[in-house]
Every structure is written in C-alpha cells, then in structure tokens.
C-alpha cells in the first residue's frame, strides 16, 4: 500500500494565538509536499470527522495531528486504518513558551518537521500470530496459588495446579490462627484453608497435580510448553500463561546468634511458637514448664537488614498475634514485645489497639545488647535505649525471635525455564521476583509469568489471596493480548516487534544479553539472534545495544530517529541560538515535561524533544548523528536506576550509563567537550523543578559555547 500522509493543524486551546498556523502549513506543504492538509479550531470535537473522511475517501493512511499532547484524547485520535503521529503543540510549545516569539514559532516548525519525517518512516505494524492456548498453569498450591487457580478457572481458563507437596495448603497448614479479616478487626480468626482446598479440588476447570514439579518451561506467552513430573511420570501441557506462587521458607535463624539462638533452647523462632500453639500447649522447651514471662523480639535493628526486608510489616503483626497466643495459653503470664519500629497498616491498626488493651502485654522500644541464662534456666535480656530506661533487664522464661519470610528460589524449585538467560527468574536484592514494583507488581521479568504471594513480597494470608486473584487477572490479560499479537505491558496493545537485518549481523550476542526480558535467543548453528515475539515488551533495548544497527521496529528505528534529527533546522553559528537534542523516556520524563506545560511552566525554547520508548533504546550512533548535525548538546532524560529502579523496562538508564562512554568517545573524536552530553534522572513528579534544571543545563552549554560543528 502506498503511503499517504495527512497533516491536521489545530488552532484551539491558544495554539492559534501563539503560533502562526499559516507558516506551519507552509512547512508541511512547502517542504514536504503533504497532499492532504486541514486546519480546525478543534479536531478533538466534531471536526475529527474530517480526518475520518480523509482516511475513508482520500486514502490517507498516515495521520499527523498537530494539536495537544499524545497523552490526551487518545480515544479520539485512534484510527484503525491509519498510523497516527501526534505533534505536541499545546503543552510543549504554546503553554510552555512566550506567545508570538520567533523561537516559539521555530520550535513549532521543528516539532512538525520531526513528526512528518517520523510518519514517512513509519510502517503500520502487522501483528504476530500463532495458535494460542487458553489455559494457565499455577505453580504452588498455597493460598495465593489456589486463589489464582480458582480466579483463572472462573474466568473460563483451563487450569493445571502443580504442588510439590502431597497436599494443598502450603504454609497455611502450619498456621494456628490468622489476623483479623472482618470488622471490627480485633480478634484472631480461623485460617479456613480447608474451604479453599475443597473449592479448588471441586472446580471443573482445575486439574490438581500434587507431589509434582515443573521440569521445564519453554515457549512464550500464548503458547508455553510445560513439562511436569508427577508420580514418576513426565506430563507435557501447553498453556498461555504461568502463575508462580511457590511461597516462602523461614529466615535462617542461625544468623541471629547474637540474640541467643542456639545458645539456649528457650530462644525460639516465631515459626516454632506457631507450631507450639497449633499443638495446643506453649511450654518452656528446656524443661516443659509453663510460661510466666516471655519476650518477643522484633529483630529490626540496623544489623538485621536482611531479616527486616524478608519480614516487612508481617513480622510485626505476627508478634502481636503470638503475644495473644501466650496470654491465652498462659493467662497469668507477662509478655514483652521489644521493637524498634511497629508497622500495622490499614485496618490492622485496630488489632494493634486491641493487643495494647491487654494489661499483660507490654511494649518497649529498645535494642537488645545481650541475652544470657540465669541459674534457674531462665533468660536475661539486657536492653539499651529502652523506654524502661537507658539500661534495663528483663527476666523471661521464653524469648521468641521474629524471623522473616524468605522466598523460595524459582530456579531450584519453581520453573526451570528453557531460556538463554537462565532457568530461574531474575531476582531482586533480597531474592524476590524482580519487577517494576510500583507500576507492574505482578509482572516478572519473564513476560507471561506472573508472581503471587510471598515469592513477590512478604505478606499475610489475606494479602496472599488478593495477590493470587490479581495474578490470575494478569494471566488472563496476557492470554487475550497474545492471541491478538499485541504487547501485554507496559506498551499495552503495541503490535510492533523487532526485526533483524541479519546480513550485517556480527553475531556478538549483545542484543540477547541486554534484553531485560529474555525475548531474544540465539540460533545454535550460527549464533544469530531471533526474537521470541510474545516475550518481547517492545522497549527497544536491543535496538540501542546493537553496534551495527541491524535491529528495528516497523514504527521505531535508528533510521527513523536519525531522520528526525536531520529534520531539525539548525541556525547558523553566528545566530547564537543553541539547539539541544533531548531524548525523553516516554514513561516518566516525557509526562513530566507534559505536566510542566500543563502547569504553564516555561521551558527553554532551544530544546528539541524526541520521545523514546526507553533510554535503553538509544543507540550510540544517534548521539553521533546529533553532534555531526550541529546540535550543541545532547540531554537524555530517564528513570532512576539501581536497586530501587523506576524504569518500566528494568535497566534502560543503567545500560545507557554504560553506553555513554561510547558517546563521550565520539565527542572526543569530534573535539567536543564531554559536558555536552548529559543524563538527567527524572520522575513524573519532578515537573515543578524540571524547567529550572533544564534551564541550568542550557545555561551551562551557553557558557561552553556553541558547537563548532554547525554549518558542516
């Protein structure tokens, strides 16, 4: 199909008062000979029909809308038969720059030029298609796993639930009672896991395999092949998505020897106390005598960082619950809860108050200096910085250590993935399934595999059930999107995917190494890359990684960005008008710029902004093109990296930091100052301070001087 571009220039929302739309029309038709051009005071209202008519009657299949931000009116400017490129005249030109100023008009011209060139280079993506399975495998038969299985089955999916033990229930079978789930949230409740087990086993859409474990998982969303070993036999099934709910194991108490663990049998863990209460008696382990006094220590000091991360607020709630256990079993006892912090989120604050009302339960903030034995077999707990005084001692019969919940490792007991990047899931610092915790909590770094329960973060039974239901919804979404050949997240609905011009491939394998999601594999014969399409999240990290630029998308490529760079009009050096190219991450940085415009914060007119899918997609050659073209500086706006990363694609900013070394080498080769290329971390909430930071960067470039490459 021949490409036909239509440009639609809006003059509403103050656009026509700030810039000359006639001159914009001249850019479109005079410089690019656009065959269809229309103007309107509001294309977002009834005049949208003009665009629809041009698509239907004039054969327009590439639409350029010069109006408001691409983040608004997305439903209005969506045309199935055409690709759409938005020119952000309203927020990033009119609302953020002086009206009628020459540089404001120049910015509008360049914004339109870049959009037209992008439209020229864009192909309408064709979706990847395959035979998809409407089935889900859930690994783990605890509360999270069973809830996920029931949720997916209720949605119409066939579910296979795989549990390594001989019975369903997971760690919930070892819990005596659970925290309050019902108003007024004061009293402990029965666990009730047997009801969930019966519901799971009786559901017509669920097949339960106990004493079973996955031997291998291969394939991609929509069509995973799972090999399951059960009762000595291997069974192969095809599913569309996977839910991982393999649970947790107690934190290793040998790391808590400083609190007397292993020194005295009367120093036990909270797991041991749970078992005691479930058995019906709480006695002193050393001699079987009753408890007159006990202390529960929340191991939450600076030296207990790992235990804190594995316990979170759950350890605090368990301490409250177990204090009630001891008081119920030993009514004349006194229980001390020793803490540094106390966290009881949400409705659990009512439960906290209920425990405080018990005169036999005493709370003291403090730090345990030493635990020793007295001559009667009891324990002496020496406290510092306590509410009882600078130095204090507690005489107790039993010391309970609050240990955390360590996630079961996915590699050894959960998945056994047949992926180039390894058998297990990429994990966070403390062993939980890695994900963008705020935006995509259930999505692991293996597309189509969703984590639920304590493999994702520490949580109680109620939260685990909620987690399982949420993971089931994500699994169903994955199956639906995969069947349409569309990305699941974060670029939901994106039909594009990477293609490779293998004739130029150097077989370095960098694309497969840097892909955050294991979407690129290598052929065993030639070591050339190929994409496992439905694993791909369309971030373009592979495109940024390739040293010979052989990777592209139908609607995003190195050639497209290079053409957009060349479309910008660079003033002659004696004009003293700097031009700074900005690559802005579309997930945080670009919305922050947008918000600055909405709030009428002035931005430097010298910036020429190109949104990118992720900073990880920025190839070093793009920087070289910018400086060779005569840009005075390059600014890359991206997300926070590190353990607390905020990148939607995990490590885009981190990868770019490495590639910046190549950019600086390019600058040295061009005899340019390295300060001309900078990376700036931006959160969406930074819109208030971002204009000042940008102005500071522009001023620093002016101080260095304009690029000597202008005019070459």
Model-inferred region functions:
Residues 674-712:
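Divalent-metal-activated hydrolytic enzyme cores
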Residues 580-582:
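Long, charged, low-complexity intrinsically disordered regions
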Residues 618-627:
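Thiamine diphosphate
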Residues 1-530, 534-578, 587-590, 602-615, ...:
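Residues forming the flavin
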Residues 592-595:
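Eukaryotic N-terminal intrinsically disordered, low-complexity regulatory regions
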């Amino acid at each position: 199909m021949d490409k036909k571009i239509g440009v639609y220039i809006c003059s509403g929302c103050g656009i026509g008062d700030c810039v000359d739309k006639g001159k914009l029309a001249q850019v479109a038709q005079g410089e690019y000979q656009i065959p269809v051009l229309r103007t309107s005071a509001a294309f977002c209202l009834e005049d949208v029909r003009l665009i629809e008519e041009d698509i239907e009657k004039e054969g327009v299949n590439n639409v350029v809308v010069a109006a408001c931000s691409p983040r608004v009116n997305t439903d209005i400017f969506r045309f199935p038969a055409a690709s759409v490129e938005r020119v952000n005249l309203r927020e990033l030109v009119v609302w953020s720059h002086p009206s009628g100023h020459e540089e404001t008009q120049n910015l509008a011209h360049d914004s339109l030029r870049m959009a037209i060139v992008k439209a020229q280079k864009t192909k309408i993506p064709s979706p990847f298609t395959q035979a998809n399975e409407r089935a889900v495998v859930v690994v783990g038969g605890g509360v999270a796993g069973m809830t996920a299985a029931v949720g997916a089955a209720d949605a119409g999916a066939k579910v296979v639930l795989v549990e390594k033990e001989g019975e369903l229930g997971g760690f919930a079978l070892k819990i005596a009672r659970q925290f309050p789930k019902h108003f007024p949230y004061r009293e402990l409740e029965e666990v009730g896991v047997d009801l969930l087990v019966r519901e799971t086993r009786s559901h017509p859409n669920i097949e339960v395999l106990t004493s079973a474990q996955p031997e291998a998982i291969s394939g991609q969303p929509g069509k995973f092949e799972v090999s399951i070993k059960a009762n000595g036999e291997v069974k192969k099934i095809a599913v569309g998505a996977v839910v991982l709910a393999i649970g947790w194991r107690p934190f290793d108490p040998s790391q808590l020897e400083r609190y007397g663990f292993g020194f005295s049998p009367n120093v036990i863990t909270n797991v041991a106390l749970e078992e005691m209460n479930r058995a019906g008696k709480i006695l002193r382990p050393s001699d079987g005598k009753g408890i007159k006094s006990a202390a529960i220590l929340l191991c939450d000091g600076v030296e207990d960082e790992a235990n804190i991360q594995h316990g979170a607020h759950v350890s605090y709630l368990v301490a409250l619950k177990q204090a009630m256990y001891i008081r119920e079993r030993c009514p004349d006892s006194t229980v001390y809860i020793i803490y540094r912090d106390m966290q009881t989120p949400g409705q659990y604050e009512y439960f906290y108050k209920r425990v405080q009302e018990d005169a036999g339960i005493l709370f003291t903030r403090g730090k345990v200096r030493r635990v020793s034995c007295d001559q009667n077999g009891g324990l002496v707990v020496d406290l510092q910085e306590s509410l009882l005084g600078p130095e204090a001692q507690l005489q107790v019969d039993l010391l309970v250590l609050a240990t955390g919940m360590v996630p079961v490792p996915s590699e050894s007991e959960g998945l056994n993935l047949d992926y180039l990047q390894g058998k297990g899931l990429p994990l966070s610092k403390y062993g939980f399934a890695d994900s963008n915790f705020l935006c995509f909590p259930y999505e692991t770094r293996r597309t189509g595999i969703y984590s639920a329960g304590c493999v994702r973060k520490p949580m109680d039974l109620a939260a685990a059930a909620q987690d399982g239901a949420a993971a089931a919804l994500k699994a169903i979404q994955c199956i639906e999107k995969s069947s349409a050949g569309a990305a699941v997240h974060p670029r939901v609905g994106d039909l594009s995917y990477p293609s490779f011009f293998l004739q130029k491939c150097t077989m370095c394998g960098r694309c497969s190494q840097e892909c955050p999601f294991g979407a690129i594999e290598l052929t065993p014969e030639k070591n050339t890359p190929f994409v496992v399409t439905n694993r791909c999240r369309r971030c373009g990290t592979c495109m940024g990684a390739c040293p010979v630029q052989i990777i592209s998308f139908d609607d995003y490529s190195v050639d497209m960005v290079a053409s957009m760079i060349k479309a910008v009009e660079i003033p002659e050096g004696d004009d003293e008008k700097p031009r700074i190219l900005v690559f802005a991450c579309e997930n945080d940085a670009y919305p922050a710029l947008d918000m600055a415009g909405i709030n009428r914060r002035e931005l430097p007119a010298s910036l020429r902004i190109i949104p990118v899918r992720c900073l990880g997609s920025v190839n070093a050659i793009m920087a070289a093109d910018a400086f060779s073209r005569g840009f005075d500086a390059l600014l890359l706006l991206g997300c926070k990296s590190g353990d607390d990363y905020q990148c939607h694609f995990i490590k885009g900013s981190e990868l770019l930091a490495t590639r910046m070394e190549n950019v600086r080498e390019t600058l040295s080769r061009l005899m340019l100052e390295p300060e001309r290329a900078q990376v700036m971390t931006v959160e969406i909430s930074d819109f208030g301070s971002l204009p000042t930071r940008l102005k500071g960067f522009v001023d620093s470039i002016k101080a260095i001087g304009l690029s000597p490459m202008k005019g070459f």
